[in-house]
Amino acid sequence: MGRKWNNIKEKKASKDASTSRIYAKFGREIYVAAKQGEPNPESNQALRFVLERAKTYSVPKHIVDRAIEKAKGGAEENFDELRYEGFGPNGSMVIVDALTNNVNRTASDVRAAFGKNGGNMGVSGSVAYMFDQTAVIGVEGKSEEETLELLMEADVDVRDIMEEDETVIVYAEPDQFHQVQEAFKQAGVEEFTVAEITMLPQNEVTLDDESKEQFEKLIDVLEELEDVQQVYHNVDLGE
């Protein structure tokens, strides 16, 4: 799974270059999570998860607080959670998750992004079956052996543990996300380099240079869309 960890690193690195856009997306996601349940992460697991993710992207406290206060204030703005599936150049696969207050606008924007960049929209289920929803938690300062030991002590089962670039990455079932984090916290870990519930491809594909360039443009256009929260794909973008 090392390659998959590299794809997550590449995604985070690319997002560092557009922090204002990332903060806006987190603000929306935090607002929705807080509005759908209690605005307290201790009793709202969805909100707690988003806040843990936000920490790994260094989202400022004032953005988090503003989104939660907006939800507390009874704001009437409502968002729908949508998932689109499609194909890029040479049969590459893409999943797009969105939060939108205008479904027609978002569907049109996503369809146009695919159509103008060598891809096409698929029907629901046409792509997702080739991905596995996975909790991915990364920490520094622990070895693979230490991580295995602390998880065993906490009686937490995981799919895999990888050690790479001084970072230990744990892959687990989505419903084990908080248990894995809590096991690390009990062992003195306070910061996480990765804290995601993501869609990992079962197999990755490589593209020729021309197709790869077109595919990267497709992903860039999708991630630039205001309503798009996450983009997952099965292409190995390593050099």
Curated annotation (Swiss-Prot):
Transmembrane intervals: none
Superkingdom: Bacteria
GO molecular function: DNA binding
InterPro entries assigned to the protein according to its UniProt record, in alphabetical order: Integrase-like_N, TACO1_YebC-like_2nd/3rd_dom, TACO1_YebC_N, Transcrip_reg_TACO1-like, Transcrip_reg_TACO1-like_dom3, Transcrip_reg_TACO1_YeeN, YebC-like
Any one Gene Ontology BP term: regulation of DNA-templated transcription
GO cellular component terms, A-Z: cytosol
Keywords: Cytoplasm, DNA-binding, Transcription, Transcription regulation
Keyword Repressor among record annotations: no
Pfam families per record: TACO1_YebC_N, Transcrip_reg
Subcellular location field: Cytoplasm
Location, primary (coarse class): cytoplasm
Family note: Belongs to the TACO1 family. YeeN subfamily.
PANTHER family recorded: TRANSLATIONAL ACTIVATOR OF CYTOCHROME C OXIDASE 1
Record protein name field: Probable transcriptional regulatory protein BPUM_0743
Native organism: Bacillus pumilus (strain SAFR-032)
UniProt lineage: Bacteria, Bacillati, Bacillota, Bacilli, Bacillales
